[in-house]
């Protein structure tokens, strides 16, 4: 019985220690990618895309997110939110449009217009 308990504790310790090592490697991997990016312009922190300006940074999941610009003086220049879920094809076309989607302010929808109203 004691041998089983020792083996169980050893296995649990190895599992948790392995998880910590894996997390540390992932953090180092992100840091390495930032340091090794070779970006001479602006490096987006969320996506590690090299762009001309912070205004050009994409959302991490552009197919399902809207990039809402925030007013000057905010902690961040923009916030990425989930596109509103709707079965209305006309609304989906608006939200999928890279120009119209972020400008949309449709009553009753949690879009960029809603973000602006609730700051």
UniProtKB/Swiss-Prot annotation:
Species assigned in the record: Candida glabrata (strain ATCC 2001 / BCRC 20586 / JCM 3761 / NBRC 0622 / NRRL Y-65 / CBS 138) (Yeast)
Any single GO BP term: ERAD pathway
Family: Belongs to the LCL2 family.
Function: Probable component of the endoplasmic reticulum-associated degradation (ERAD) pathway.
Signal peptide range in chain numbering: 1-14
Protein name per UniProt: Long chronological lifespan protein 2
Alphabetical keyword list: Signal
Gene it is expressed from: LCL2
């Amino acid at each position: 019985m004691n041998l089983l308990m020792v083996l169980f504790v050893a296995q649990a310790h190895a599992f948790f220690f392995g998880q910590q090592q894996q997390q540390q490697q992932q953090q180092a991997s992100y840091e390495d990618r930032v340091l090794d990016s070779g970006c001479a312009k602006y490096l987006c922190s969320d996506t590690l895309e090299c762009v001309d300006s912070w205004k050009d940074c994409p959302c991490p999941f552009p197919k399902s997110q809207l990039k809402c610009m925030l007013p000057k003086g905010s902690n961040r220049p923009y916030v990425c939110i989930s596109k509103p879920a709707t079965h209305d094809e006309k609304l989906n076309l608006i939200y999928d449009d890279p120009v119209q989607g972020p400008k949309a302010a449709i009553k009753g929808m949690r879009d960029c217009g809603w973000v602006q109203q609730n700051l």
